[in-house]
Amino acid sequence: MSAELIAVYKDEQIIDLESAKVLGLSDGIKALNGTEPIYFDDSPLALEVIRHSCAHLLAQSLKALYPDAKFFVGPVVEEGFYYDFKTASKISEEDLPKIEAKMKEFAKLKLAITKETLTREQALERFKGDELKHAVMSKISGDAFGVYQQGEFEDLCKGPHLPNTRFLNHFKLTKLAGAYLGGDENNEMLIRIYGIAFATKEGLKDYLFQIEEAKKRDHRKLGVELGLFSFDDEIGAGLPLWLPKGARLRKRIEDLLSQALLLRGYEPVKGPEILKSDVWKISGHYDNYKENMYFTTIDEQEYGIKPMNCVGHIKVYQSALHSYRDLPLRFYEYGVVHRHEKSGVLHGLLRVREFTQDDAHIFCSFEQIQSEVSAILDFTHKIMQAFDFSYEMELSTRPAKSIGDDEVWEKATSALKEALKEHRIDYKIDEGGGAFYGPKIDIKITDALKRKWQCGTIQVDMNLPERFKLAFTNERNHAEQPVMIHRAILGSFERFIAILSEHFGGNFPFFVAPTQIALIPINEEHHVFALKLKEVLKKRDIFVEVLDKNDSLNKKVRLAEKQKIPMILVLGNEEVETEILSIRDREKQAQYKMPLKEFLNMVESKMQEVSF
């Protein structure tokens, strides 16, 4: 079965076998010019087809178990697939095995999956009385609607799908959640069931192991256990509270970045949190991003709370006249921004409404784009290396709708390619995926569980300099428009720390650990020595805690281990008298003794091991 053809890939689109029949291509589908065959296996394109069909298998089973069920959408997503639906019946996660069993029943029936195409009028009539399907159709333009059938079940869908349910043998329903209709909290709440599917038993087994590991590493769970951050309903959804340990972790990263940025010629700047709406109209945010912004009125003047830092940095640039000798100008800011995210998509620190970007904007001449991007790529590599992340780059090129002439776009895109080539970075190309105002490079990191995360971006902008009439005096004493490069490597501190927490499972490396050393005095008479040692370490910029509660030694050691503290020092008579310390080293997975002076030299050295 693994060699069976299930679809083809052509013009960045998957065409399943049923769609090929509708298009009259079924006889020559393999011979179509420019097609890539998709076989039944665990490749990304095949999994997209498999998981889409498994979503329909889920809906078919739900309809059989709960006849009043109505269905909204059931897409393939990064973590598998889901289906949003509603029913008068109460459904909990305890019902998932029953639903899964029904899915296996239908799969074993080897039902053919067929497709027909209806007009809008026919589709509205076919799904008469189904307000959820009518809601789906209202968001689709055109007059052609695909309907897929398997057995007595049918669903409005554009595909792609497998030719038969017999392919669906290795799947698992993973969780149940609530989801607002269309992600809008003003709409009714639907039930959402998530699932995963693979072509092979091994693929499913490996994934389920990864899921269990991911649950242990969930940053929301670790945030509570390690006292890093919290959320409070009285404050509001998507607005994190940084607790002392989390703030220490974050500040350490900020400080390391700041040191590196200053050495790399960046200047710190700071813009206001709210700006008049007039300036957002000039930038285009008011017309194109308004629904994601928060607004307030002061003295009858409308202000917008900034969703991005770029306008403030533009105003810094405009605060003085510039010549070519001043360029490049590199401004950075840990800028707090606010974006109106729908409550249904909020997720711990990964998706919040207030966050801080490691933002920078570079104003340079066109000829300086390559060298500036090259420097950013070098900076990115050092940061990713320090945090033990592998990463990949994706270059997005000119979309169909864009500003600027072909020559300008070609030069900008070529500059990005040459910078990537200079650093011998393999990269993917997203043809037409750039912003309308310039090409970009996306930075995607891979964590310890082999999950990919979108973090940083390097974006060439030829739009905002034009909108704000930015200029510098060139060598010929003429006014010339600079290029603006938007640059964020981490993306946001919130998102990066969430990913970092899950990458290390809370076992942060020594140089950023929120508590780096735990001092455990065995008895009260050892407490004074512990406090003195704490002060010595604090002067070396080490985060230290003294665990001096009236608990047993074993309990205090377990507490330090549970808090994932890299080094634990147990202080008793011998340590106090000889100043030879007993060290439990998490990173080395060893216990050893070391004279105090040598230990201090070691921790100082560990703090200096990492620089960006």
Curated annotation (Swiss-Prot):
The record's free-text note on cofactor binding: Binds 1 zinc ion per subunit.
Family annotation (SMART domains): tRNA_SAD
Keyword terms: Aminoacyl-tRNA synthetase, ATP-binding, Cytoplasm, Ligase, Metal-binding, Nucleotide-binding, Protein biosynthesis, RNA-binding, tRNA-binding, Zinc
Subcellular location: Cytoplasm
Stretches for region Catalytic: 218-509
A GO molecular function held by the record: ATP binding
Cofactor: Zn(2+)
Source organism, top-level taxon: Bacteria
A cellular component term, taken from the record's GO annotations: cytosol
Catalytic activity: tRNA(Thr) + L-threonine + ATP = L-threonyl-tRNA(Thr) + AMP + diphosphate + H(+)
UniProt xrefs under InterPro entries: aa-tRNA-synt_IIb, aa-tRNA-synth_II, aa-tRNA-synth_II/BPL/LPL, Anticodon-bd, Anticodon-bd_dom_sf, Thr-tRNA-ligase_IIa, Thr/Ala-tRNA-synth_IIc_edit, ThrRS_anticodon
Positions contributing to Zn(2+) binding: 310, 361, 486
Any one Gene Ontology BP term: threonyl-tRNA aminoacylation
Pfam families: HGTP_anticodon, tRNA-synt_2b, tRNA_SAD
EC number of the protein: 6.1.1.3
Family: Belongs to the class-II aminoacyl-tRNA synthetase family.
Subunit structure: Homodimer.
Function comment: Catalyzes the attachment of threonine to tRNA(Thr) in a two-step reaction: L-threonine is first activated by ATP to form Thr-AMP and then transferred to the acceptor end of tRNA(Thr). Also edits incorrectly charged L-seryl-tRNA(Thr).
Protein name: Threonine--tRNA ligase
Naturally occurring in which organism (per UniProt): Helicobacter pylori (strain P12)
Taxonomic lineage: Bacteria, Pseudomonadati, Campylobacterota, Epsilonproteobacteria, Campylobacterales
Record gene name: thrS
